[in-house]
Amino acid sequence: YIFAGWTIYAAMKHPYFSNPMIYLPLILLGIDKIYKKQKPYVFIWSVALAGLSNFYFFYMLGIFMVLYAIFRYFDLFADRSIKNIGKWLGVFAVYSVIAVLIAAVILLPVILPVFGTDRFKAENYVPLFYDRIYYEKYLGCLIGENMIQWGVAGYTAVSLAGVFVLFSKKKKYTALKAGFVLLNVFLLLPYAGHVLNGLSYVSNRWIWAYGMLIAYIFVKIYPELFALTLTEKRKVFVMLLIYCILALLPEAARTQRNLMAMVLLSLSTFTVLSFGNIFTRERNLTVMVAGFLIAGILFNMHYQYSYEKDYLSEFTDSGEALEKLETGVDRAVLSTDDPSVYRYDQMDTNSSENSSMQMGTNSTAYYFSVASSSIANFFDEMYLNTPWEQHYNNLDGRTILDRLASVKYFVVKKGKESDLPYGYFRLSGEAEKNGKTYLAYADEDALPLGYTYDSWISREDYDKMTVTEKQQALLQGVVLDDSSLPETETHFNDREVSYYTSEGKGCRLKNGKVVVTQENAQLKLVFEGEENAETYLITEGLDYEGLSPREMISDKKWSKMTTYEQNKLL
């Protein structure tokens, strides 16, 4: 459970992704204690800690908590009357409410903004099924390769041998069998990934719970390894044969990692089947099973962190993380020795998102899963190119937006002073890092962090304005649905300039369309620029269909590629 693929891959990338793995066993233990009519403290505090820890995984834990309680009830009790079910439902409801109330001090302030985000309210496309290649590689990926959509199973081969033994047992372990089938159905249907991901995009980040089931199955089945009948051994052998054939039948699944996983699975299964025939000492089987368990863990780690997979390149080298967070941009701002409260903006400085949290500054960059929908709506109105509402770097170098956001300093690299927006004339701070010099220029007319308006603009009038008019209007009046303030007399000085298009490298114009024929294509727009002005390029109605990597390669070239090259491309 601890060394499944989720830990090896996901928990290393995001350490808090291991939190649900900590709380799940405790919650399940608490459920068992309640069914045994023992004190509910383990359940209440485990649920409360899970809620305090992370709302995202708390949602998933809640679903699996309910599923486990249902399966466990039908496994333990013969009385399945509505009255008895209702009694236990009430008991768990009371204890769950107590736990949520304990966690509410942190859970509510975090979860309430989530419901207002566009990310939560977005209508995500959920296909009925995954692509064919997902199903072709599915069986092998349980103990081999990583699946798509965060389906990082990576279970040891010996644990799957335990599953074979489980299904060889007739009229036993019904709840475990049903749970195993159910979670596999969840992995096979995109809609399950949609629901378990908070009704957002399809993602199988719940797969750590599947790892708990696999581990629990093996622990329950372990004593059975020493008492298999001949009939049961035959069933296990047939299941092994069917699994290996189906897992390796598709050509796309025949990767080195999957093949090695099948070898380990076969060896561990044959070891279990050999007990009682080739060797009879229980200690020998115990040592060999432990050996295959360790070998499976090391095998998964080796492939995940291999040079070919190059997973380690996504991380910062040991001892360099703090150095990366202490960016030259923040150092330049801090060198101003300005004690007031202000924000800074930057352009093309390669600064790290959220470095301000480490450095004690206030920037216009942001990267966190929970983002205010009001900010996202404002960015949409201003045509700010931020593909993710929860991830943005700057305010596009626009003077007006910087003023509205109380930006006092703008940072650029030395030699890139041409990137400075209007108004930043005085050099106030300077810092050097890694051979590069960062310059912080001050805006003498910066607005304070808090400011007021003396007139208002109706939302109806504001919505009719163009984007350039909107940002000018916000400097003159506040947008409200109604107010007793005087109405703003807006004044605009923007204008459109004439231009013509010229075909560039890798594209051509045809019937009102831009036809792109190669990567990094260029279309030239030729115009006379205005002096002492910001120039905006606004594109509207520019729609296109995505192109898959396969469509970029001719059939002739595709046929000459190896399976490995094709899989790597896809």
Regions found by a protein language model. Give the residues of each.
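Membrane-interface micro-motifs in multi-pass membrane enzymes
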Residues: 2-28, 35, 51-61, 145-159, ...
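Hydrophobic cores of alpha-helical transmembrane segments in multi-pass inner/ER membrane proteins
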Residues: 23-29, 60-71, 99, 103, ...
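Contiguous transmembrane helix-bundle modules in multi-pass membrane proteins
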Residues: 38, 57, 175-191, 197-324
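Membrane-interfacial, low-structure loops and terminal tails that flank and connect transmembrane helices
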Residues: 76-89, 229-235
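Soluble catalytic regions of membrane-associated enzymes that act on cell-envelope
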Residues: 288-570
